[in-house]
Each structure stands twice: as C-alpha cells, then as structure tokens.
C-alpha cells in the first residue's frame, strides 16, 4: 500500500513512494514495471530495511550529499528522507546504508524540509508534539 509519493525536483519522470513494511521505492515513469528499491541494500549486502512499519512520508532530500551523484548523475536516485509509524526519521539512498536521523518512541506522522534552509527539518509526532531537527553538514556526508 502506498502512503506517500514525491516527484524528483528536476527529473519529473522519477518519483519515490513510501508504503507498508518499511518499503521505499523509486520509479522511472518511462519504465513503470521496474521499481528501484531504495529502503534496503543491494544483493551484495544483507537486506537491512530502516524500519519495519508503515512509511508515512517520503521527500527527495537535496541537502544530503551523495558520493555517487556526481559520477553517474543520470543513473542515481537522489537520497530520500522518510518517516515511519515506528518513530524513525531517516535518509535512505540506493545501495547505501540508511542514515537514521531521529528515533522516537512514538510514530513520526509527517515532516517537512525547509526549502530555504534544507538543514532544518520539522516533524509532527504522534503525541501531538513537534520536533525540530537541524542537520550538520558533517553528519550528512557519511559513506
């Protein structure tokens, strides 16, 4: 089941979706029969979903640096930020280990990345509270 969808900021034929059981997939709408798994590592690594519950929201994350984007821009998917029912806010990237930004004891129902200052993220938590996260550049360049 799909809970959230986001369209790539510059390649409008690429979208990313968040759904059940921790799944995050990207689709090239020109080839819709071949989804690209984002939330687990590739076949040469152990499958490692960042969460096991519903993914409530996904957004392309232009703030996180990807080591592979420059070398193969046409083939790579931008990193994706996601939040889940089990309280995880993380950045997932194709064939990379997830980068967990926040782990709460309640669901993170929604979030938004400030377009003017993309290091700032605001989260809506299940307990009717708001979380504000400011990301440092050093933490975002993890290999």
Name each model feature, range by range.
Residues 32-34, 96-97, 138-140:
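Short coil/turn linkers that define WD40 beta-propeller blade boundaries
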Residues 109-143:
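Blade-level signature of beta-propeller repeat domains, shared across WD40, Kelch, NHL, RCC1
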Residues 11-16, 65-81, 98-99, 118-122:
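Structural hallmark of WD40 beta-propellers
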Residues 1-27, 31-34:
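Beta-propeller domains
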Residues 36-48, 97-102:
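A short beta-strand motif characteristic of beta-propeller blades
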Residues 18-21, 83-86, 124-127:
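Conserved strand-to-loop turn within each blade of WD40 beta-propeller repeats
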Residues 1-8, 50-72, 106-113:
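Canonical WD40 repeat/beta-propeller blade segments in eukaryotic WD-repeat proteins
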Residues 24-28, 89-94, 130-135:
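WD40-repeat beta-propellers
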């Amino acid at each position: 089941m799909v809970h959230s969808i986001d369209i790539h900021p510059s390649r409008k034929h690429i979208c990313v979706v968040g759904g059940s059981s921790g799944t995050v997939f990207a689709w090239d709408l020109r080839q819709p029969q071949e989804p690209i798994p984002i939330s687990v590592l590739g076949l040469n690594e152990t499958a490692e979903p960042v969460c096991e519950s519903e993914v409530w929201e996904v957004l392309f994350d232009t703030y996180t640096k990807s080591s592979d984007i420059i070398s193969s821009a046409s083939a790579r998917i931008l990193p994706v930020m996601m939040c889940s029912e089990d309280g995880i806010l993380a950045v997932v990237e194709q064939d990379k280990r997830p980068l967990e930004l926040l782990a709460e004891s309640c669901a993170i129902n929604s979030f938004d990345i400030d377009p003017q200052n993309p290091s700032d993220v605001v989260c809506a938590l299940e307990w009717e509270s708001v979380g504000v996260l400011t990301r440092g550049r050093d933490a975002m360049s993890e290999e």
